[in-house]
Amino acid sequence: MERPISSVHFEYVALFILCTTVFASATTSQHQESQSRQHKEASYLKMVVNATELPMEEYYDYIIVGGGTAGCPLAATLSQSFRVLVLERGGVGSGNPNLMNQEGFLTNLLNAETEDSPAQAFISEEGVPNARGRVLGGSSAINAGFYSRAHRDFFDRSGLPWDLTLVNQSYQWVEKEIVFRPKLKTWQSAVRDGLLEAGVTPYNGFTLDHAKGTKIGGSTFDGSGRRHTSADLLRYARPSNIKVAVYATVERLLLAGSSAIGALYRDQRGRHHHAFLREHGEVILSAGAIGSPQLLLLSGIGPRPYLSSWGIPVAHHLPYVGHFLYDNPRNGITILPSLPLDHSLIQVVGITDSGAYIEAASNVVPFISPRHNAFVRSPLYLTVATLISKISGPLSAGFLRLASTDVDANPRVRFNYFDNLVDLERCVNGTRKIAEILRSRALKDFKFSNWFGEQDFRFIGPALPLHQTDFPRMANFCRRTVSTIWHYHGGCVVGRVVDPHLKVIGMDSLRIVDGSVFSVSPGTNPQATLMMLGRYFGFKIITERNDYK
C-alpha cells in the first residue's frame, strides 16, 4: 500500500489537499434554476451599502458585527421587528464568478494572501495553514458546501437550554432556501460503497440528519454548480429595517461602564464611524472563532493582566476570552486514480462509532514539472482523489492571543492538536477505517497494475503505514500529516465567556452568536448549525423583547 509518487510536483498537490475543491457540469434546466436564483439575489443586494455611504453617527436597535454564516440569518430575523445594522469587513461575493461557482473555489484560496480577498489565510503556531472568511456570507462563501445537521449529543453538551422544536424549524428555514441534493458520480459512489463494505452501516441514503452509518448529505451548491451562502438568507429581511454595510472594519466596541453602547468602525477611506444603540438594544458579535475573541480583547474585555501587558485599558476582567479554542484535525490520503474521475465535492460521509467521520473528494490539479521546458508553456493536469478522516470533538484545546493591536492583523492561534490522547485514538480509528475502504472491492478499479499483474494504489504524499495494527506508527502518521478541515471553534465558550443566553458574562447589551461559543463541533460539518443558530437566536431575542414589553 506504500507507493508514493515522487515525480509529482508536491506543491501543487498539497494545494489540492488544502483546498479540497470541487467542480460540476450543468444541464440546461439546472442553468435555468441558477438564473432564477440570481434574480432573487437582487432583492438582498438592495440592502447592501458600502460603509463609506453611511453617516458618521447613527442609532440602531441591533448592531451585528460580522455578516457571516450566523450573522446573516440573525440579521434577517431581527429586522422583522427592529432596526438592524450589519457591519461586514469584507465585500460582496455575488458578483465574483470565482467565488460563486465551484470552478473558482481553488482560485479564491490561492489568493487568500491579498488584502481584500474573500478568504484570509492564517497559520497556527503548529504550522498548520488555515483560512477564515472575509466576505458577506463569511465562511459559507468560501467552503466546500457540505450541509449536515448537528448530532444529538451536541445539543446535550452545549450548555444551552435548546428548544428543539425551534431548532428544527430554524434548520428548515435555512434548508428551503439554500440546500440541495447532490448527484453522486464515480468517486463519491465508489466511496459510498467502500464505506458500506468496511462496515460503516447502515446506509441512510440522502438525509440532512446526523445518523450513524453512511449517508449522502446536502450541498449549498445547486445543480448548476452555483454557490448559495448565508447571505442569500438576507432575502428574508425587512428592507426598511436593515442596512448591511460592507468594507466596514470594526476596530473596537464602544462601552460605558459594564454596558455596550455601540461600535467604532472604519470604512475603506479610513474614516471612522460611530454606530450607537437605541434603548434596550444590543451589540451582537458574529465575527467567528477568530474575530469575536479578538474584538473582545481589543475592546478591553478579557484577562486583566494580559490586557495590561498590551497597554489596553481594561473595561471588564473576563479571564477565559481566547481560551478553549478548538480545531478538528484532518488526516487522510491522496491517490492518483487509474481512470478519469469527475470533479466532486464532499457529498458522502461515513459516520463511524469510533469517533471519526470519513469523507472524500476528487479533483483535477495543475502539475508543472520541476524541469522547465521551453516548449511546454501550459501545465499538465492530474486527476487526484482523497479520503479524509475528521475526528469528532475534539477534546484538545488551545488558545488565541493578540499578535497586534491592529484588528486587521491575524491573532496568534494554537490548537494543540492531539494533546488529548482520546483525539489521537480517534484519528487512528479513522485512518484504519480509510485503510479498510482502500481494501474494499468498490475501490479496486482505481488501482494500477504492475508488470507482474499485481495491483496497488499510487499515493501522492504520505501513504498509510503498512502495519495498521501498530498503534505508535499510526499515531505518528496522525501527528505527521495533521491538517485542518476548517471547523475551528471556541474562544468564547458557554459558561466561561457567555451565559446560556449567549450574553457576555458581566456585561449588559453584549451578546455573541457564532461558532466561538461552541466547545464541540456540531456533527460532520458546522455550517448548517451556525446558520440555524443565527435564525434561532434572532427569534429568541425577539421573544425576549416582546416579553420585556
Give the predicted meaning of each segment.
Residues 104-197, 226, 387-408, 412:
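Redox-cofactor-proximal catalytic regions of oxidoreductases
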Residues 2-61, 80, 540-548:
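Extreme N-terminal leader/targeting segments of oxidoreductases
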Residues 241, 293-396, 404, 421-425, ...:
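Mid-to-C-terminal "cap/lid" subdomains and adjacent gly/pro-rich loops that border
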Residues 33-156, 163-165, 313-321, 327-333:
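N-terminal glycine-rich phosphate/pyrophosphate-binding loop and immediately adjacent elements
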Residues 141, 161-261, 266, 332, ...:
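Conserved redox-cofactor binding core of oxidoreductases
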Residues 520-539:
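A conserved FAD-binding loop/helix module that cradles the flavin
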Residues 245-246, 251-256, 444-521:
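A glycine-rich dinucleotide-binding beta-alpha-beta segment and adjacent secondary-structure elements
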Residues 84-85, 90-95, 99, 163, ...:
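Glycine-rich loop(s) and the adjacent beta-strand/alpha-helix scaffold that form part
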